[in-house]
Amino acid sequence: MAEERAPRGRDRDRNREEKVDDGMIEKLVAVNRVSKTVKGGRQFTFTALTVVGDGLGKVGFGYGKAREVPVAIQKSMEQARKNLATVDLNNGTLWHAVKSGHGAARVYMQPASEGTGVIAGGAMRAVLEAVGVKNVLAKAVGSRNPINLVRATLKGLSEVQSPARVAAKRGKKVEELNHG
């Protein structure tokens, strides 16, 4: 049986996943080198964008900056753990379709049937996998900037509401809601 190869080229660093002792899924979305020109030349720093989730509906993102890549990643992971938000999920998918945006990044996500998988690109995929979504159809339109895409995805996920929550807000029973 052939061994599975590691991703090469552009996919090499994309969506590195790690499970830590506390059961959180950590995903590295992007690492960027930033240069600042000073009198003596250029100073290089690194930024890291990470997403952390428990796979059961909690997710957060962090953005860290440092002179070294590992330090930037660690800072962003710590920030992501501090900013966890809860998302209403429906057996591994969303309750309803949702549109959202941040800056020029626009995202569209809709629930998918069992066996579809996560059909999403780049930064959106990292967020959806970390939060625990197993089946979803998603599309990013406009800017593909990873930070704005992560923010737009999280904003969209926060807008997803279960029928029970909608009914509670309206002071009704779930059966009384008009599904049509």
Curated annotation (Swiss-Prot):
InterPro entries: Ribosomal_Su5_D2-typ_SF, Ribosomal_uS5, Ribosomal_uS5_bac-type, Ribosomal_uS5_C, Ribosomal_uS5_N, Ribosomal_uS5_N_CS, Ribsml_uS5_D2-typ_fold_subgr
Domain S5 DRBM: 24-87
Keywords, ordered alphabetically: Ribonucleoprotein, Ribosomal protein, RNA-binding, rRNA-binding
A GO MF label: rRNA binding
Record's GO cellular component terms: cytosolic small ribosomal subunit
One Gene Ontology term from the biological process aspect of the record: translation
Described function: With S4 and S12 plays an important role in translational accuracy.
Subunit comment: Part of the 30S ribosomal subunit. Contacts proteins S4 and S8.
Family the entry assigns: Belongs to the universal ribosomal protein uS5 family.
Cross-referenced NCBIfam families: rpsE_bact (TIGR01021)
Domain comment, as recorded: The N-terminal domain interacts with the head of the 30S subunit; the C-terminal domain interacts with the body and contacts protein S4. The interaction surface between S4 and S5 is involved in control of translational fidelity.
Stated name of the protein: Small ribosomal subunit protein uS5
Species annotation: Xanthomonas campestris pv. campestris (strain ATCC 33913 / DSM 3586 / NCPPB 528 / LMG 568 / P 25)
Gene from which this protein is expressed: rpsE
